[in-house]
Amino acid sequence: MNEPLKSRIDFKQSTLQNEEISLKKGLDFNQDEQFVPYNPQLEAQENEGRLEGEIQSALKPRKSLWKRLITVASTILGVSVIAQAGQWIYQSWINSDWIALGAASAGGLIVIAGMGSVITEWRRIYRLRQRADERDKARELLYSHAIGNGRPFCEDLAKQAGINSQHPAYIRWQSTLHDTHNDREILELYSQLVQPILDKQARAEISRSAAESTLMIAVSPLAMVDMAFIGWRNIRLINRIAQIYGIELGYYSRLKLFRLVLVNIAFAGATELVREVGMDWLSQDLAARLSTRAAQGIGAGLLTARLGIKAMELCRPLPWIDNKPKLSDFRKELIGQLKNTLGNKKKE
């Protein structure tokens, strides 16, 4: 109670007045159309597509000087052969050598047929490249809030897939559209109402091919026959998936698609394969419960399913928004079919 009072402290007001208060500059935000909702799956697909492009550019052979010289020499040789053939036909006509003219006509028809085949193959390869461009455009539209580009784009996709205007899903999609819908909303509605028709068919093909590969490996005792059968089934699966999505494959376009699928699996699919299959197998100890052939059959079936899933991604015109197929979707089905088959075989 008897403590002495503290001395008074006087503050200078000038220091507070002269002190400059630093404030951040205010930001004025416009309407909501400038903001895009964050979608982690679309971002993951964008990163995967960027990785795939880097892989393709790395694997693409660079044009060297020798290849350019060979190209020029081949062009000169081709022009010389055509000129020589024209001169030979002219001399045969002057000399009335009808046998030579007949041979020249047959050779000309063969050349025309070969050129037609080359043009057809080029068109099919171009169609496969165009599908990749369409997928990139769809990814851009999914981030766009503009109006006027989404509807004709989706109508063109439906036409390419063979879905006519009288299809129930197409009619339901058309009835849900309004003038106020932007491009992103139109594509989302199309991916929810129309695109699942083709996805369901592709999933059924993958399930059937994976089940056949699993049962073939688990039951058949011939390894070489198994390898040939699975290779043939995998090529047929890729052709069937491409046909479902409206892509007609030729010889070189089929090889290109198969190469893209294998490259995608090798570089982008190994981690997903280990994550979805390895941990589940270790937790349930399936390898100990099943025989060696059965385990090999399940592995072959899952690889076939993985190949089909990547073929879907490369042939599908739209990027995945939701319901992306995973190996876990086919794993339980394969195990159940294998157990039923082995159980029936033991009873017999």
From Swiss-Prot:
Keywords per UniProt: Cell inner membrane, Cell membrane, Membrane, Transmembrane, Transmembrane helix
Q: Where are the transmembrane segments?
A: 69-89, 99-119
> GO cellular component terms?
plasma membrane
List the InterPro entries hit by this protein, alphabetically. DUF697, UPF0283
Tell me the compartments it is located in: Cell inner membrane
Membrane disposition:
Multi-pass membrane protein
Q: Which HAMAP family does the record associate with it?
A: UPF0283
Sequence similarity: Belongs to the UPF0283 family.
Name the chain's protein.
UPF0283 membrane protein PMI1371
